[in-house]
Amino acid sequence: GYASYWAPNIFGHDALTTLAIVGREVPRIELGTSVVPTYPRHPMAIAQQALTVSAASEGRLTLGIGLSHKVVIESMMGMSYDKPIRHIRDYLSILGPLSQGQPVQYAGEDYTTYGAINAKGAQPFDTVVAALGPQMLKITAEMAAGTITFIAKLSEVPFPGLSEVPQPVFDP
C-alpha cells in the first residue's frame, strides 16, 4: 500500500475536505495537501478546517500551503496579489500558533487576528510552504516545517545559501 496521499487543490474537489474523508476511511497513511492557496482563505479559517481534518484523521495531516499564481488570484478570483512575501509572513504568523492548538494575537499589515480554535480531538499539524525563491525559502525556513517545490526536486533548485536553512526541508 501507500505510505502517504497528497491532495492537490486545483479547480476540483477541495483538498482538505477530501483528506477528511480519506482520513476517516483509510487508516494509517499520512495525509497532506500540495497545496492549498492562501489568498482565498483567511489563515484562521484554514486553521479551523485543517484542525478538523486532523481530528478526523487522528493527527495524520501535513498542511501544504502556497501563494498560488498571480493570474489565478488576480484574473480569475479578482483579488490583489500585491506583496506576496508580506502576505505569507502574516499568514504564517497566524497559522503557526493555531496549527499547534495555541491562541493567536497578531496585528500585521494584511491580517489582524485575535482568537483560538477549539477543535475537539484535533492534534497539532505541520505546515509546509510551496517555495522556490530565496525570500520564500527564508520565510519557510523560519516559520514552517518545510517546503514543497513545484515541477522541480529541491536538489535541482539552485539557490545560494540553501545549505544554511536551519530546519529540515520536505521534498515529496
Where are these regions (language model features)?
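Active-site-adjacent structural elements that line small-molecule/cofactor binding pockets in enzymes
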Residues: 2-172
